[in-house]
Amino acid sequence: MDFEIYLFDIEGTTTPIEFVHKILFPYSVGKFETFFRSNSLERKWIEKLLEEGKRDSTYSRQLTDSPQNLSDYCKYLVSVDRKSGPLKEIQGRIWKHGYENGELKSSLFADVPSFLKRIQSAKKKSAVYSSGSIEAQKLIFKYSDFGDLTEYFSAYFDTGVGGKRESASYSRIAEQLGIAPEKILFFTDIKEEADAARNAEFKTTLLERPGNAPQPKHSHPKISSFENFNP
């Protein structure tokens, strides 16, 4: 196929949704208060979290910078699956500690490692675009149940380039990669993300994995595995 870059979503694409929601999220929820009490987070991230809380009309409690209060707000953000930048930064740091001390090991779909190898063998490149922080993305592929797979990725993108349902985000990714958008194939499990990528002239493919939510009617190519996908 005439693509130069294969851009991967993580949750529901390379990694089972169940791992994210039943392992990673609960692990961070159990560590929030201890993390805030450790005073290891730079003040700028606390300020960003406080600013978000003040603007959050869905959160009824007053937000202060006490460890308990910050922890409660982060737990709330997880419960509503909010794609919050400060939350993702905090979770990434908590997960880093968990991976490094052996409490966490990431789960990948079995077809992912061999597909990454085929892409590399074809002299193409792989990259990641996820709502999780770049640090968290790297951890998932470094501490996977198939070993360290970070050698296969040339770039990582998070919501620093914009939201995943905004076409401008994909245009920024193409610009940063220095690749024409039509030479990039984006894999995701969410129709609206694929729509946004296609509007930026990316090529797209939707993954229909076990545990993924059914998607509205769409015209994107779809696959259930990378096993027979030739780069």
Swiss-Prot record:
Keywords assigned by UniProt, alphabetized: Amino-acid biosynthesis, Hydrolase, Magnesium, Metal-binding, Methionine biosynthesis
Region of interest (Disordered), residue spans: 206-231
GO molecular function: 2,3-diketo-5-methylthiopentyl-1-phosphate enolase activity; 2-hydroxy-3-keto-5-methylthiopentenyl-1-phosphate phosphatase activity; acireductone synthase activity; magnesium ion binding
Cofactor(s) needed for function: Mg(2+)
Organism domain of life: Bacteria
UniProt xrefs under Pfam families: Hydrolase
GO biological process: L-methionine salvage from methylthioadenosine
Cofactor binding description: Binds 1 Mg(2+) ion per subunit.
Pathway as given in its UniProt record: Amino-acid biosynthesis; L-methionine biosynthesis via salvage pathway; L-methionine from S-methyl-5-thio-alpha-D-ribose 1-phosphate: step 3/6; Amino-acid biosynthesis; L-methionine biosynthesis via salvage pathway; L-methionine from S-methyl-5-thio-alpha-D-ribose 1-phosphate: step 4/6
Principal EC category: hydrolase
SUPFAM superfamilies tied to this protein: HAD-like
Subunit field text: Monomer.
Family, as annotated: Belongs to the HAD-like hydrolase superfamily. MasA/MtnC family.
Job of this protein: Bifunctional enzyme that catalyzes the enolization of 2,3-diketo-5-methylthiopentyl-1-phosphate (DK-MTP-1-P) into the intermediate 2-hydroxy-3-keto-5-methylthiopentenyl-1-phosphate (HK-MTPenyl-1-P), which is then dephosphorylated to form the acireductone 1,2-dihydroxy-3-keto-5-methylthiopentene (DHK-MTPene).
PANTHER family with a match to the protein in the record: ENOLASE-PHOSPHATASE E1 (PTHR20371:SF1)
Name recorded for this polypeptide: Enolase-phosphatase E1
Organism: Leptospira borgpetersenii serovar Hardjo-bovis (strain JB197)
Gene name of the encoded protein: mtnC
